[in-house]
Amino acid sequence: MAYRKRGARRETNLKQDERMQEKEDSKNINNDSPKSQLSEKVLSKKEEIITDNQEEVKISDEVKKSNKEESKQLLEVLKTKEEHQKEVQYEILQKTIPTFEPKESILKKLEDIKPEQAKKQTKLFRIFEPKQLPIYRANGERELRNRWYWKLKRDTLPDGDYDVREYFLNLYDQVLMEMPDYLLLKDMAVENKNSRDAGKVVDSETAAICDAIFQDEEPKAVRRFIAEMRQRVQADRNVVNYPSILHPIDHAFNEYFLQHQLVEPLNNVYIFNYIPERIRNDVNYILNMDRNLPSTARYIRPNLLQDRLNLHDNFESLWDTITTSNYILARSVVPDLKELVSTEAQIQKMSQDLQLEALTIQSETQFLTGINSQAANDCFKTLIAAMLSQRTMSLDFVTTNYMSLISGMWLLTVIPNDMFIRESLVACQLAIINTIVYPAFGMQRMHYRNGDPQTPFQIAEQQIQNFQVANWLHFVNYNQFRQVVIDGVLNQVLNDNIRNGHVVNQLMEALMQLSRQQFPTMPVDYKRSIQRGIFLLSNRLGQLVDLTRLLSYINETLMACITMNMQHVQTLTTEKLQLTSVTSLCMLIGNATVIPSPQTLFHYYNVNVNFHSNYNERINDAVAIITAANRLNLYQKKMKSIVEDFLKRLQIFDVARVPDDQMYRLRDRLRLLPVEIRRLDIFNLIAMNMEQIERASDKIAQGVIIAYRDMQLERDEMYGYVNIARNLDGFQQINLEELMRSGDYAQITNMLLNNQPVALVGALPFITDSSVISLIAKLDATVFAQIVKLRKVDTLKPILYKINSDSNDFYLVANYDWIPTSTTKVYKQVPQQFDFRASMHMLTSNLTFTVYSDLLAFVSADTVEPINAVAFDNMRIMNEL
């Protein structure tokens, strides 16, 4: 924000004292060179130089120094010229601190997003695996032989009330994360140890299963079959078949993955088209392609659908984060300026132009404040990165530094108004109007009303009669980005007058008109200060035209590498820009052209493509999970966590700090999107086989039987004597879902009181925070209290009765005087038995192909000599040599 210098009266007294001091200094220092005198007068007093990065302009502490310290200051002037110049340079550097601190962590997160296709698949996708389980005789003794069953590979249940449903939702999420974009069976095939002729099976897990079965007590026919297992190659068709041991559901998954691979043939035409068109057609870049691509080359087309969530619309926090990340990335690829004018030489020249040896007005010393090459480079990068990422900027300046304001006139000319936060833009424009424009024509100060829909420049345009000045104001007022769709991407493009630099001539005409005015209401010193500031800038007309052209060219070249629509919306936070750094850029820009290297462009393009593709894939995942949650009746419960997971997987967001209202708005946007067909098919596969998956789990039961009186335990071939029921014959059945939906528990109560066991049918975990009893806890407590009291409500796990603590192999059957009982039985269906021949499937894929993720690695690129680089109008970018 602009602000005026406080303590003005006090400063005028100080200035008179300082002028007297300067006269004394000039008498004492006759031996020093004129340059030394000049530098000392301009830069020795800290209180004379006001830096833009201060929030308040305070009177320097040096004013308060004692007479002793002032005499020390006089002694310092007598140092040698060389030492003194070093001090001056150091002091200048101290006065402007670059505003930007690179957040390397964000940049690393962006660059670390790699295409998922790069992950090499080493195993098939599996939910099931065969396991050996013991067999118990009728008397409870364990047999020596085992039986194989299909069990879940990862048998885990999440915490919560609807555990089983959440299990299936988590399973689906796991499938989505592991769903491969392509499968090349040759890469994962391993040797079958039991093969006669060194044959191979599809993956290491199949080999391990074959090995375990071969060593088990299996019939000779099965061993012979394993010995025959090997791959079958059809070289003429580039096809290979591998034997695999898979559960039928796993086979359906992998067969689906094989038939819906995303790989496409890769050739030079695609690589050529993959390079952004504007870079292909840019004569400054020389591109060559390696034409030796093998016929087996493949690639995975990146998913570059445009932003379906419209994050710029009502997602302020998310939009701020994404633009910040883009800003940091863009700054990292904007080239550094080269061969800037020597800071010291330029300050000396400016001092001569200002004739500061005949110093009569204090404000002119501020013209030289903070001019250094670091600030110039910082400003250059900030402007381009902000335009590329559409980050809003705010301006820091001091109203009394006329040079800053005149530089600000160039800035407002070449950068569209929308790029600045309105309060900052209004303050800067008001300072320019009241400090330079209105005083030149003798007009009264503009009293701007806060909240006025018009900006100060728009008001001034209507009041100023001078054609050139009004014409320039009109250009600035209507300077906006043009929205152009290039290669399907919305670009924010600068006005053609800015791109070719002609607008700088328009600015100079306005400045010349202002410098010729009489400033009738102002002192002569004031008029001269403004004129000298304009003179300093107008001396650099050629360099400013070149700078404007260079700024536009680099902005457009890097913009070609952006793949997401450039939406222009004001951001929550802003990038600070000091007008003294703009002065540094204007005064120090040389004639050396800098253009981004091809490697930088390709890197920027790849990072943008990878982020954009990952963004779309994560949207597809989130939409699929929302649909699955809806179908599993988990919609309300899981929704916020689904959206949080979506944001976490984008890597750049701090999810904990995103406001809830934006989370729910994001949920609503995701809910409206269609599900991608592959993800929908995968969910349907899971939904159709939920019962098989439940049966294979050791933690999921298909129901529970509860009774008023104890029921005798039954012998089970897999577990011995346990409270597990394998069928529901003879029990009254009630569906758990219906029970929870209706809330009518009278039927259960009546049956239990009549000593009729009730079977509640539905998937539930053995151990759960919300047991089946708590699901029916709304019963009349007086009737049901005794039933609840007689059982462990939170543990439904089967009870295993052992003979003694030393043996895990035998179960209690011999004590005929005591019959083990339980008031609760778990209804658990028998898992599917493992049948070797029924589980052997042949999978088919290409014999070989190579997937390339970095397509630009095939392109060798170089640039013309920077001095010969041309802009869009086929003229050299930098003409002022």
From Swiss-Prot:
GO CC entries: T=2 icosahedral viral capsid; viral inner capsid; viral nucleocapsid
Annotated compartments: Virion
Gene Ontology MF terms in the entry: RNA binding
Site location (Interaction with the intermediate capsid protein VP6): 221, 225, 229, 840, 842
Residue segments, region 5-fold hub: 1-82
PTM characteristics: Sumoylated with SUMO1 and SUMO2. Sumoylation of viral proteins seems to have a positive role on viral replication.
Comp. bias intervals (Basic and acidic residues): 9-27
Hydrophobic as annotated region, ranges: 395-415, 423-443
Keywords associated with the record: Capsid protein, Inner capsid protein, Repeat, RNA-binding, T=2 icosahedral capsid protein, Ubl conjugation, Virion
Polar residues: bias regions: 28-39
Short name of any one Pfam family annotated for the protein: Rota_VP2
Keyword Isomerase: no
InterPro entries: Rotavirus_VP2
Domain of life: Viruses
Residues making up the signal peptide according to the UniProt record: none
UniProt region (Disordered), positions on chain: 1-46
Stated family: Belongs to the rotavirus VP2 family.
Function in brief: Inner capsid protein that self-assembles to form an icosahedral capsid with a T=2 symmetry, which consists of 120 copies of VP2, with channels at each of its five-fold vertices. This capsid constitutes the innermost concentric layer of the viral mature particle. It encapsidates the polymerase VP1, the capping enzyme VP3 and the genomic dsRNA, thereby defining the core.
Subunit composition and interactions: Homodecamer; each decamer is made up of two conformers of VP2, called VP2A and VP2B. Interacts with a VP1-VP3 complex. Interacts with the intermediate capsid protein VP6. Interacts with NSP5. Interacts (via N-terminus) with NSP2.
Domain notes: The N-terminus binds RNA. It is necessary for encapsidation of VP1 and VP3. The N-termini of 10 VP2 molecules form a cylindrical hub underneath each 5-fold axis of the inner capsid.
Name of the featured protein: Inner capsid protein VP2
Organism: Rotavirus A (strain RVA/SA11-Both/G3P5B[2]) (RV-A)
